[in-house]
C-alpha cells in the first residue's frame, strides 16, 4: 500500500465512504417500513412506478425502495440485509462491480438493485453460471420479488421457446450467461417476429462476473449446423504431424525485431510458443508438408485448408494435453474447463481443433460443424444499457474491466473480520520435493484433526497426490473432472474434522464448506495449493474456500522451480541463482526475491492473457459492427416493413454497378463490350440483351436510364402476376431473409479463415489488425452485393404460388456450450402406434400399409 493510500484510504474505501449517506438514509426508513402491513408494503411497488412516471428517477427512489426490499426479505426469508450488503446493492445499481468475499451473501445483495431497476418495466436479467444456481436463486430470492408484486421468471436449458418468451417477459429473469447469449443469437435467426423470445437488453446483474467476462471471454458462443466437409484430412494431417520434428527458435519474432531486420534462426520442422499457445511451421517444415501433399506452394489460397489443418494437428499433439485440457470417455473427447476443472459435456472446440484431437486419440472423428451464428460475451454484454456484477475476486483484473467494459471495481468491506492466516509460499527445487512436503503438511494437520483441502491444477497431479497419501495410510476424497458426480457430497464433508480433500479448481464456486466444532478448535480449514495458477484471481478463490464469515483457517502454496509458471515466465537469471546455491534435497527455499519473482510471473501472464483478449476484441469489433448491420436489416424485415422501395433500390444499384464495370465514360459506345454486360446482367435481371443499334449514339448515363426503365417495367409486370400485392410483399421478405442468412453464414466462415491467415502480415511489417479491417470491409461489401444480386435474381424468376411460407436456411444441430449435462428423457409418442396391418385411421376401410401408410413411406 502506498503512502497516499495509507493517508487517504484506498480508492474502494473512498468510494464506500462517498455512498454511506445513501446507506444511512436507507436504514432510516426501517421503522417506517416495519409498521406497514403486508398489503401496504406490496402497494409501495405501485407507488414507486407512479412516481417514476411522474418524473422521479431511480436514484431518487433508491433509499426507500431498498428499505422496502429489506423489510420484505425479513418477512419472507427471515433474512435482513447487513449494512455491507446495502453498500453492494448501491454499487450494482450504479453499473459497477462489487467485490464481496466468499460467504458474504451476494445472492441476497442482488435483490436490492433488481427490484429498483425492475420498476421501469423494461426487464432485469440476473445472470448466473449454471442452471442449478439460476433455478435455486429464482425459487429462493424470487419469493421476495413476488411478495412485492413483481413477476419472476427463470430460463433453463431444456425449456421450449414459449416458456422462454414468458420468462423473459417477467419483471426479473434468472438465466445463465450461455442461455442468454444463445437466445440472442437464435432470435436473430428466426423467420417470424412471433418467434422472438427476448425483449431489448436493458439491465443485468452478473454473478461471478470475472468468470463470465474474463475467463470465458476468449471462447465465443457458437450456434452450428452440419457441414458438408469430409473428416479425412484430419486423419491424414495427424499422420504427418507425428512425422514432423519439433525445433526451437533463437528468439521471438516481434514487430521491432522485424523492423530491425533481425533474423530468427529456427531448427526442426515446427516451433511451439507455449506462452502464447501458438505453433508455427519452419521453412524446413513447409517444404516437408508441400512434399507430403504434392503441392507447389503451401501459402497459395487454394492450400489454406491444408495449412490450417496441419497447424491444428500440431496444436493437438503439442499444446493440448490429455487429462488436463480434455479427457477421453466412451470413445469421445470431453473438454475440461481450465478454470473450474469441470468436464463440459456437449461442448466442442471450434474451428476443427476438436476433430484434430479426435484424430490424435484415435476416436471417431465427427464431421466439422458450420457456424451459423456467433458472438463473444464481451460484445454481447456491452449491448446492455447498464450492467453490474458481483464476485469474490475482481480487483486484480480491474484494468480489464475498465478498459473493455467501462466498469470499475469497488471492494466491499466484510461483515466480520477475516480470521484466515495466509502464509508465505513454500518453494522447493524440484516437483518431487514439493509433493513430499505437501504430504508431510497433510499428515501434520491430519494428526491434530484439522480438515485439509488440497488444490491442484491438473487431474494428473490430483491422482499422483492421491497415490502418495494412500501409501501413507491417510484416508481422503478426490474431486476432479473424472468424479464430479460426487461433488456436492464431498464438498459438504470437506470442513469436518479429519477430512482430507484433493480437488482441482472445480471445488471453487457456489458450494459452502461448513466447519464442525472439532475442526474449528483445530484451526479451521487448511488450504494447500500445489501450484500457483496463471491467474492470481484463481489462487485467491482457492484461499477464499477457508475463513468464511469470520471462521478460522490458513492457506499456503507449495511451489517448485520446475512448475510451468516458473519454467515459462520466471526470470532465468533468478532460477540460475537458486540453482547455483547448492540447496540440499527437501530443503525449503525462502527469499523475498523468489516471492517477488512468482508475483511478477503471474502479473506477466495476466498481462499476456489480457493482451490476447484485447486482441480478440480488436478483431471481433470488426465482426460486431458487421453483425449489427445484418441483424438490424433482418429485424426490419421481421417487423413487416414494406420492402418494395428497398428492392427497387437494389435493382437500380445492380444496373449502376454492372454498367460502370463494363462500360467506360471515355470510350465510344461502339467500343463497349456488350457481350460482357449482357452475360453479367441478364441472369439477374431478364432484360432484352443490349445490341449495337440500341446503344448507338447514347452515353453511359443514358444507357443506365434505359436499362433501369426496362428493369422496373419487368418488375411491375411480375407484380401484376400476383392476385394480391401483399403476396409479393411477403415474398420479398421471405427471399431477402433467405439470402441474408445464407450469405451471412458463409461470410462468418470466410472471416474466420481470414483471421487464421492474417497473422503472416506481421512478417511483412504490416499491422495484422489494420489488414484484417481492410480485407473484412471489402469482403462485407462483396457479401452485400451478393445478397442484392441473389435477392433480385430470385424475385424476377419466381413462379406465383398461392401460399408463401418462410423457412430456415440451415438446420441448427448444436451449440458449443451446454449448461445442463443431465440425462434427457426419451421422447414419448402422443398417439397410439398404427401397425401396417391395422385398419387405416382415415376410415377408408383399407389396411394402413395399403392406404395412408404407403403415402407416409413415400414422404
PLM region spans:
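Short Cys/His-rich zinc-binding micro-motifs
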Residues: 830-849, 853
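Hydrophobic, well-ordered secondary-structure elements that form the walls
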Residues: 454, 502, 744, 780, ...
Amino acid at each position: 500500500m502506498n503512502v497516499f493510500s495509507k493517508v487517504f484510504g484506498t480508492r474502494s474505501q473512498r468510494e464506500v465512504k462517498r455512498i454511506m449517506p445513501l446507506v444511512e438514509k436507507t436504514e432510516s426508513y426501517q421503522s417506517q417500513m416495519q409498521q406497514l402491513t403486508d398489503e401496504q408494503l406490496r402497494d409501495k411497488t405501485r407507488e414507486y412506478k407512479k412516481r417514476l412516471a411522474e418524473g422521479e428517477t431511480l436514484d431518487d427512489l433508491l433509499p426507500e425502495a431498498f428499505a422496502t426490499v429489506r423489510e420484505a426479505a425479513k418477512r419472507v426469508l427471515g433474512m435482513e440485509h447487513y449494512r455491507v450488503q446495502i453498500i453492494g446493492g448501491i454499487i450494482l445499481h450504479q453499473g459497477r462491480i462489487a467485490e464481496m468475499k466468499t460467504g458474504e451473501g451476494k445472492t441476497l445483495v442482488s435483490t436490492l438493485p433488481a427490484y429498483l431497476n425492475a420498476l421501469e418495466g423494461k426487464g432485469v436479467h440476473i445472470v448466473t453460471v449454471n442452471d442449478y444456481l439460476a433455478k435455486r436463486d429464482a425459487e429462493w430470492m424470487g419469493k421476495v420479488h413476488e411478495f412485492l408484486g413483481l413477476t419472476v421468471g427463470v430460463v433453463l436449458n431444456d425449456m421450449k421457446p414459449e416458456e422462454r418468451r414468458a420468462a423473459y417477459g417477467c419483471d426479473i429473469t434468472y438465466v445463465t450467461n450461455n442461455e442468454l447469449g444463445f437466445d440472442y443469437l437464435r432470435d436473430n435467426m428466426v423467420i417470424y417476429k412471433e418467434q422472438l423470445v427476448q425483449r431489448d437488453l436493458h439491465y443485468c446483474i452478473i454473478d461471478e462476473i470475472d468468470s463470465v467476462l474474463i475467463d470465458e471471454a476468449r471462447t465465443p458462443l457458437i450456434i452450428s449446423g452440419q457441414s458438408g466437409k469430409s473428416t479425412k484430412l484430419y486423419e491424414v494431417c495427424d499422420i504427418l504431424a507425428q512425422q514432423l520434428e519439433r525445433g526451437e527458435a533463437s528468439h521471438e519474432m516481434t514487430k521491432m525485431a522485424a523492423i530491425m531486420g533481425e533474423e530468427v534462426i529456427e531448427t526442426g520442422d515446427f516451433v511451439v510458443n507455449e506462452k502464447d499457445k501458438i505453433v508455427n511451421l519452419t521453412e524446413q517444415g513447409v517444404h516437408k508438408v508441400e512434399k507430403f501433399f504434392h503441392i507447389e506452394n503451401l501459402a497459395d489460397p487454394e492450400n489454406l485448408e491444408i495449412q490450417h489443418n496441419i497447424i491444428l494437428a500440431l496444436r493437438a499433439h503439442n499444446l493440448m494435453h490429455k487429462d488436463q485440457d480434455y479427457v477421453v470417455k466412451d470413445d469421445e473427447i470431453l473438454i475440461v474447463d481450465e478454470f473450474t476443472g469441470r468436464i463440459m459435456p456437449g461442448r466442442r472446440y471450434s474451428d476443427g481443433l476438436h476433430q484434430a484431437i479426435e484424430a490424435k486419440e484415435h476416436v471417431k472423428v465427427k464431421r466439422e460443424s458450420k457456424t451459423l451464428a456467433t458472438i463473444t460475451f464481451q460484445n454481447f454484454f456491452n449491448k446492455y444499457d447498464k450492467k453490474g456484477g458481483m464476485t469474490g475476486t475482481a480487483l486484480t483484473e480491474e484494468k480489464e474491466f475498465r478498459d473493455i467494459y467501462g466498469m470499475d471495481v469497488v471492494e466491499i468491506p466484510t461483515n466480520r473480520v477475516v480470521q484466515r492466516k495466509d502464509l508465505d509460499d513454500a518453494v522447493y527445487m524440484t516437483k518431487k520435493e514439493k509433493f513430499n512436503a505437501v504430504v508431510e503438511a497433510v499428515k501434520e494437520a491430519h494428526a491434530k484433526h484439522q480438515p485439509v483441502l488440497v488444490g491442484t491444477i491438473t487431474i494428473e497431479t490430483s491422482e499422483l497426490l492421491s497415490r502418495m497419501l494412500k501409501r501413507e495410510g491417510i484416508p481422503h476424497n478426490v474431486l476432479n473432472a473424472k468424479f464430479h458426480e460426487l461433488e456436492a457430497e464431498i464438498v459438504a464433508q470437506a470442513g469436518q474434522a479429519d477430512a482430507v480433500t484433493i480437488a482441482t479448481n472445480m471445488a471453487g464456486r457456489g458450494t459452502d464448506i461448513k466447519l464442525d466444532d472439532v475442526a474449528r478448535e483445530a484451526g479451521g480449514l487448511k488450504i494447500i495449493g500445489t501450484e500457483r495458477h496463471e491467474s492470481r484471481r484463481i489462487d485467491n478463490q482457492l484461499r477464499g474456500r477457508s475463513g468464511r464469515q469470520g471462521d478460522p483457517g490458513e492457506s499456503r502454496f507449495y511451489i517448485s522451480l520446475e512448475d510451468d509458471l516458473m519454467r515459462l515466465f520466471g526470470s532465468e537469471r533468478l532460477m540460475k541463482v537458486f540453482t547455483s546455491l547448492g540447496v540440499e534435497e527437501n530443503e525449503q527455499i525462502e527469499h523475498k526475491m523468489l516471492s517477488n519473482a512468482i508475483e511478477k510471473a503471474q502479473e506477466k501472464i495476466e498481462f499476456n492473457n489480457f493482451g490476447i483478449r484485447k486482441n480478440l476484441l480488436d478483431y471481433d469489433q470488426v465482426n460486431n459492427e458487421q453483425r449489427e448491420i445484418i441483424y438490424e436489416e433482418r429485424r426490419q424485415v421481421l417487423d413487416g416493413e414494406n420492402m418494395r422501395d428497398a428492392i427497387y433500390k437494389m435493382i437500380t444499384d445492380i444496373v449502376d454497378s454492372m454498367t460502370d464495370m463494363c462500360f467506360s465514360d471515355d470510350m465510344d459506345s461502339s467500343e463497349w463490350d456488350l457481350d460482357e454486360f449482357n452475360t453479367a446482367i441478364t441472369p439477374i435481371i431478364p432484360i432484352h440483351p443490349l445490341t449495337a443499334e440500341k446503344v448507338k449514339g447514347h452515353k453511359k448515363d443514358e444507357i443506365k436510364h434505359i436499362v433501369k426503365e426496362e428493369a422496373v417495367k419487368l418488375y411491375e409486370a411480375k407484380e401484376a402476376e400476383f392476385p394480391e400485392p401483399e403476396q409479393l410483399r411477403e415474398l420479398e421478405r421471405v427471399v431477402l431473409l433467405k439470402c441474408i442468412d445464407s450469405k451471412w453464414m458463409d461470410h462468418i466462415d470466410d472471416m474466420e479463415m481470414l483471421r487464421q491467415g492474417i497473422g503472416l502480415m506481421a512478417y511483412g511489417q504490416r499491422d495484422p489488425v489494420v489488414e484484417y479491417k481492410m480485407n473484412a470491409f471489402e469482403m462485407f461489401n462483396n457479401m452485400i452485393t451478393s445478397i442484392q444480386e441473389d435477392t433480385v435474381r430470385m424475385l424476377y424468376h419466381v413462379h406465383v404460388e398461392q401460399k408463401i411460407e418462410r423457412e430456415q436456411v440451415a438446420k441448427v444441430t448444436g451449440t458449443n456450450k451446454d449448461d445442463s449435462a443431465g440425462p434427457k428423457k426419451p421422447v414419448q409418442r402422443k398417439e397410439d402406434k398404427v401397425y401396417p396391418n391395422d385398419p387405416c385411421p382415415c376410415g377408408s376401410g383399407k389396411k394402413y400399409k395399403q392406404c395412408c401408410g404407403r403415402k407416409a413411406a413415400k414422404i
